[in-house]
Structures are given as C-alpha cells and as structure tokens.
C-alpha cells in the first residue's frame, strides 16, 4: 500500500466525489452528503492506494485558532481534518491509521501544532476508540442532540 499527498486534478476530484457518494450511501454519519468540488478544493489531500485502487483518503486544511483557549492559545496553527474515509472492503486493515499518521507527519513539518476534527458518526463508541485510543487524540467537547 502506498500513502501519499496528492495534488487535485479533475480525475482525482471525480474519484473523491465517487468515494464520498459511497460514504453517503452507507448512512453511517449524521447529515453526510457526497462532496462536490467546493468541499474538496483548497484542502491538502492524502491518499491510500494499492495496485491502482484507491483505498481511502484524508483531506483537511490549515487554520489559526480563535476562541479555542481552553486547549490552545489564539493564533496557534492547526490542521483541521475535514474527512477521513476508508472504503468498506478495506476497513480494519490499518489504512485510516496510516493515513492519519502520514498526514500528521506531513503537516508537522509546516509548523502545525495541533490536529483537530469533528465527527458525526452514528457509531460514536467505535470512532472515539479509534481517535483517542489508537491515534492518541484528546477529547475536547461533544455536541449532543435528542429528536423530539
């Protein structure tokens, strides 16, 4: 398996949109809809590929913190992960972990001090285990809802 940072082109954009449509069809994330060009442009894109087949992706962008003083000083550079996706047929193979670690090392070289993300998965126990126990992230906040 090869993990690398990719530059966006029309062919890659089409593939990322197709993969995000697969994610939408899974109905595993509250409110998730497939991406369009504007969701992907201006992001750093990391891919997992094997024998010409895309196995997963991670994309996100660099920000400076504002009003996050409980965890970092305002103006601190951080990388916001927008999406991390692995195709269903290749889950539990360490691909998501590898994508995260590769992106972590890549953004660290540009002076990034934190990685942040939000998740709307319906399987919160599994995702918290993945991000906290397996990847070493810390829990910051939670937004809960109850339909009435």
Regions found by a protein language model. Name each.
Residues 24-49:
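Active-site rim helix/loop that mediates acceptor-substrate recognition in acyltransferases
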Residues 47, 53-62, 80, 85:
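Conserved beta-strand in the GNAT
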Residues 72-88, 142:
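Conserved acetyl-CoA binding element of GNAT-fold acetyltransferases
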Residues 97, 109, 113, 121-141:
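Conserved active-site alpha-helix within GNAT-family acetyltransferase domains
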Residues 91, 116-127, 145-148:
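Conserved beta-strand-loop-alpha-helix junction that forms the acyl-donor binding cleft
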